[in-house]
């Protein structure tokens, strides 16, 4: 059977190991060809091809549930569940999503883009099955990176406590080291340790010992020690197995995650076990593509690249430095002058640019794993005792630490500097990764300063502001991708005064107040509006909090019409902040808020999304003209 002939994953149940092996190669070929053309997550999916095929051969996917953590690993799943023909549209506008999405396929029983959610979701599904008396297998597949997340550990702790709830957790361990005892001996020991007859003998023996008059109670502790000794002896293949057994799971593994025969045998055996089962599979990230196997970090995810060389396809023209790069270079320079600066990331050193900080200041760099809550509170502790912590976290991931920002940082006025990369729409990764809520969820927190630069040069200045500000927490948000090409300084940056905006263009018909990435498009929109006789003042707000009301309120009162523009949600966002300030100042003037409506933004290229959302110069000008069309420009001023 060819992959193109597969119309339903249950067809895998009738295939031999050799037939599955041929499908595995076809999946890898399609995976590589597609990601090379569209970009996307490369290494994770290549590493789970055999695991996916073997698991699905042992399941009935019309009935059973498979929950993939994050979705990085799920490209083979997409190909096996009716999406092979459309796989070339991966991460493209109106095409397949880069992550799992319940609305995309009935086989996507759980959607995710943030890590560590799979075990909790799968446990909920297992409990729902039991409540309804259904016959259904539930499996969660989680990577070793996602297992560092506190939510995953919380779920393991709970699931292990529910000894009668059958749930399989598969650890896709794609670390480069592989335990020596992978293979037949491990399979044999798994069978020996979990054999139903032996389990019954052990239970009977314990009962009989405890029932011996007088002696029984004293024997029981000895028997517990005997059980522990046996458990540790039969678990020599993995120290981690002891931990999962103590949590209440039956531990199987580690097994070779690329040996189809062993995988199928182990999965079939695991399905026969009662209660929660933890299966540890060792895989190779990037399996089958030598370039990715040799550089697993770089090829975790890639933009479009040359399949023959693995090198990224060159841009059609030179681009300015990325905001992330400017952030990293500036932070390193500031840290050279301030030994108290500490860099913190939550498993995203390369994405946030903190890998550059680590190269220079390894002793002042901390990667806490997928643990944003811990990252924020640890930063608070560092700040409490005089350090200058810089927490570089994607905007969408900082949402996970909202309580810690309030409880551990803001209430105590601790000077933690939050640097929010990927603010605004990020592009092809879609709704789970867009950073469109930070202005709304941060500005409501008392004492927290929120900044957004109009370009990369202003980001450098705001980095100085953030380091120097010690009255409480402060945050700066900046987008994915290249800057506008603003001239950069190597050092000697002046800080941006807290709460001070700037007027970039003057006009008498309209006041446009823009923040961050929307400042330059608003300036260009003002030029377009001038062609239609509408003369606009444009203000770079710089701060969502505190607002420069000393500048904004007199301008609004004099001009009489206000437009706010932001790359974020309108509900509760920057425009709402300006509107509140106008109302509090007793200024009742027509106000138009341009931003992202109350909906989740789909996946597409960043420029495509900005066009779709009307956040381009022409889109902003069009929205303003349509708003003014019902009100003459010469209307009386407030």
From Swiss-Prot:
Binding site for Mg(2+): 144, 174
InterPro entries listed in its UniProt record: Dxylulose-5-P_synthase, THDP-binding, Transketo_C/PFOR_II, Transketolase-like_Pyr-bd, Transketolase_BS, Transketolase_C, Transketolase_CS
Assigned keywords, A-Z: Isoprene biosynthesis, Magnesium, Metal-binding, Thiamine biosynthesis, Thiamine pyrophosphate, Transferase
Chain positions recorded as thiamine diphosphate binding sites: 72, 113-115, 145-146, 174, 289, 372
Cofactor note: Binds 1 Mg(2+) ion per subunit. Binds 1 thiamine pyrophosphate per subunit.
EC nos: 2.2.1.7
Entry's Gene Ontology BP terms: 1-deoxy-D-xylulose 5-phosphate biosynthetic process; isopentenyl diphosphate biosynthetic process, methylerythritol 4-phosphate pathway; terpenoid biosynthetic process; thiamine biosynthetic process
GO cellular component entries: cytosol
The protein's name in its UniProt record: 1-deoxy-D-xylulose-5-phosphate synthase
Organism in which the protein naturally occurs: Gloeobacter violaceus (strain ATCC 29082 / PCC 7421)
Name of the coding gene: dxs
């Amino acid at each position: 059977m060819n992959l193109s002939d597969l119309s339903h994953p249950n067809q895998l149940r009738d295939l031999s190991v050799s037939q599955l092996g041929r499908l595995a190669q076809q999946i890898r070929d399609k995976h590589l060809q597609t990601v090379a053309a569209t970009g996307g997550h490369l290494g994770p999916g290549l590493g789970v091809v055999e695991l996916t095929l073997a698991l699905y051969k042992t399941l009935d996917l019309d009935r059973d549930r498979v929950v993939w953590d994050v979705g990085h690993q799920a490209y083979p799943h997409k190909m096996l569940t009716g999406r092979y023909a459309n796989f070339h549209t991966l991460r493209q506008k109106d095409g397949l999503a880069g992550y799992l999405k319940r609305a995309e396929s009935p086989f996507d029983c759980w959607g995710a883009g943030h890590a560590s959610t799979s075990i909790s979701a799968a446990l909920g599904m297992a409990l729902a099955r039991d409540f309804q008396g259904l016959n259904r297998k539930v499996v969660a597949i989680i990577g070793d990176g996602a297992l560092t997340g506190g939510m995953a550990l919380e779920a393991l702790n709970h699931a292990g406590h529910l000894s009668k709830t059958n749930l399989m957790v598969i650890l896709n361990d794609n670390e480069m080291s592989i335990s020596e005892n992978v293979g037949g001996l491990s399979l044999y020991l798994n069978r020996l340790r979990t054999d139903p007859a032996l389990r019954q003998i052990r239970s009977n023996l314990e009962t009989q010992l405890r029932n011996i008059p007088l002696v029984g109670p004293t024997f029981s502790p000895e028997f517990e020690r005997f059980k522990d000794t046996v458990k540790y002896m039969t678990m020599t293949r993995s120290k981690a197995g002891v931990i999962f057994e103590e949590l209440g799971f039956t531990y199987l593994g580690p097994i070779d995650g690329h040996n189809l025969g062993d995988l199928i045998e182990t999965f079939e055996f695991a399905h026969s076990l009662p209660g929660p089962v933890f299966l540890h599979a060792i895989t190779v990230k990037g399996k089958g593509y030598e370039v990715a196997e040799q550089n697993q970090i770089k090829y975790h995810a890639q933009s479009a690249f040359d399949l023959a060389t693995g090198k990224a396809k060159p841009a059609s023209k030179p681009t300015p430095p990325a905001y992330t790069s400017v952030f990293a270079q500036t932070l390193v320079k500031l840290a050279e002058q301030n030994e108290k600066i500490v860099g913190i990331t939550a498993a995203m050193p390369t994405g946030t640019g903190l890998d550059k900080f680590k190269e220079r200041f390894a002793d002042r760099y901390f990667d806490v794993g997928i643990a944003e809550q811990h990252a924020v509170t640890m930063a608070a502790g560092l700040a409490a005792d005089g350090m200058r912590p810089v927490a570089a976290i994607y905007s969408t991931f900082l949402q996970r630490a909202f309580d810690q920002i309030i409880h551990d940082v803001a209430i105590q006025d601790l000077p933690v500097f939050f640097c929010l990369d990927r603010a605004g729409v990020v592009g092809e990764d879609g709704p789970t990764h867009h950073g469109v809520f930070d202005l709304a969820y941060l500005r409501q927190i008392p004492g927290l300063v929120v900044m957004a630069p109009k370009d990369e040069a202003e980001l450098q200045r705001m980095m100085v502001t953030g380091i120097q500000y010690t009255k409480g927490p402060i945050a700066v948000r900046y987008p994915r991708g290249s800057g506008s090409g603003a001239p950069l300084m190597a050092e000697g940056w002046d800080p941006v005064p807290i709460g001070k905006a700037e007027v970039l263009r003057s006009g008498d018909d309209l006041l446009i107040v823009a923040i961050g990435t929307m400042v330059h498009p608003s300036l260009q929109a003002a030029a377009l509006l001038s062609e239609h006789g509408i003369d606009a003042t444009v203000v770079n707000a710089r701060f969502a909090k505190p607002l420069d009301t000393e500048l904004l309120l007199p301008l609004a009162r004099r001009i009489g019409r206000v437009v706010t523009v932001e790359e974020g949600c309108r509900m509760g966002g920057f425009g709402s902040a300006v509107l509140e300030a106008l109302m509090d100042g007793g200024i009742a003037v027509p106000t138009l808020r341009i931003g992202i409506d109350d909906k989740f933004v789909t996946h597409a290229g960043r420029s495509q999304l900005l066009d779709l959302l009307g956040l381009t110069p022409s889109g902003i000008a069009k929205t303003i003209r349509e708003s003014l069309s019902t009100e003459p420009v010469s209307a009386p001023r407030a």
